């Protein structure tokens, strides 16, 4: 379980393909504190640490993860937003994030707004996806590349988020431009409500 408050960015230093799996080696400030079997969110995707050295660690993404996320497009040198799992004795500063990415979305616009930034994203839409809770609501929560954000101006297939300078500079949002594919996780509460309505 995560909160969507990104701790740092990690740099991809090696990529190894193993049949349908990809092993990613990453370097980040807290790598030396990690241990095997620990869960880390990478651009919002929960992955397990399988190997660790002094300042790097390795995680494996399987086919299902690669199909639903942007991890398969990573290259050596890319920045990835990372967050360790949430401590249950602390404040929930973001929102409840599972690290189970639902789909990807494409950035269609980046606008400067008096020192902050407004990003517009287009995501897959169908009535079936909406029935499963894959939609956004105004002032609801959404996770973009692992960052907990508030939705603005949603339509059936687009939404906007407002990014303050700190978030822009300390996450990989500064590398997102028109055409960039990002990972999105819809609000778990909306998915549960949609499922309950479907079963009632």
For the regions a language model picked out, list residue spans one by one:
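Conserved loop->alpha-helix
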Residues: 1-200
């Amino acid at each position: 379980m995560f909160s969507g408050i990104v701790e740092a960015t990690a740099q991809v230093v090696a990529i190894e393909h193993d049949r349908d799996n990809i092993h990613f080696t990453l370097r980040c400030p807290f790598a030396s504190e990690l241990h095997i079997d620990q869960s880390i969110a990478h651009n919002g995707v929960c992955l397990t640490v399988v190997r660790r050295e002094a300042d790097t660690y390795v995680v494996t993404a399987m086919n299902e993860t690669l199909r639903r996320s942007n991890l398969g497009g990573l290259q050596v040198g890319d920045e990835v937003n990372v967050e360790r799992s949430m401590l249950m004795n602390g404040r929930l500063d973001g929102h409840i994030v599972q690290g189970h990415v639902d789909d990807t979305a494409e950035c269609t616009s980046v606008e400067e707004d008096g020192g902050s930034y407004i990003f517009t994203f287009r995501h897959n839409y169908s009535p079936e996806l909406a029935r499963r809770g894959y939609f956004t609501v105004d002032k609801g929560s959404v996770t973009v590349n692992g960052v907990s954000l508030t939705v603005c101006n949603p339509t059936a297939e687009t939404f906007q988020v407002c990014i303050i300078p700190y978030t822009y500079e300390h996450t990989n949002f500064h590398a997102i431009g028109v055409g960039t594919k990002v990972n999105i996780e819809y609000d778990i509460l909306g998915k549960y409500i949609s499922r309950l309505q479907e079963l009632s």
